[in-house]
Amino acid sequence: MADDEVKPIVRIADVDLDGHKKVPYALTGIKGIGIRMAYAICRELGLDEEKKLGELSDEEIERIEEEIKKLSEGESNIPSWMYNRQKDYETGEDMHLVGAELEMTVKQDIDRLKKIRAYRGIRHELGLPVRGQRTKSSFRRGRTVGVKKKQ
């Protein structure tokens, strides 16, 4: 397929992706799919990783969409240690969330932490770092935290 026959925009998982990028790099435009997962999807489907996304046939694009759906249901052959949602809080299943579903789930997790007044939830409420970083010299924007300056 010549370069002028490349589809400029390809829609996968409700996201418009650049058809001029190589397949794995284009797939990273979908929220929840990083470069490692994109390569895993390509290898699982037997796609040429050097091909541009716009050069793929409609059938190959359909297969990519089906694989992404399988990931979110936990039915893919990709190992579960690569999933972004292992041992889900409600179901206990391993799944890989993408797009709006991922954003919604993360928001629900944070809201749950806030509701039960967990330390992490309180830090989220206050807009402070959650993962134990120091606040004396970092995260100074917006509010006074840490040590006051001597006068």
From Swiss-Prot:
Residues 133-151 have a biased composition (Basic residues). Keywords: Ribonucleoprotein, Ribosomal protein, RNA-binding, rRNA-binding. InterPro entries: Rbsml_uS13_C, Ribosomal_uS13, Ribosomal_uS13-like_H2TH, Ribosomal_uS13_archaeal, Ribosomal_uS13_CS. GO terms for biological process: translation. It holds the Pfam family Ribosomal_S13. Residues 131-151 are annotated as: Disordered. GO terms for cellular component: cytosol; small ribosomal subunit. One of its GO terms (molecular function) is rRNA binding. NCBIfam families: PRK04053.1, uS13_arch. Belongs to the universal ribosomal protein uS13 family. Located at the top of the head of the 30S subunit, it contacts several helices of the 16S rRNA. In the 70S ribosome it contacts the 23S rRNA (bridge B1a) and protein L5 of the 50S subunit (bridge B1b), connecting the 2 subunits; these bridges are implicated in subunit movement. Part of the 30S ribosomal subunit. Forms a loose heterodimer with protein S19. Forms two bridges to the 50S subunit in the 70S ribosome. This is Small ribosomal subunit protein uS13.
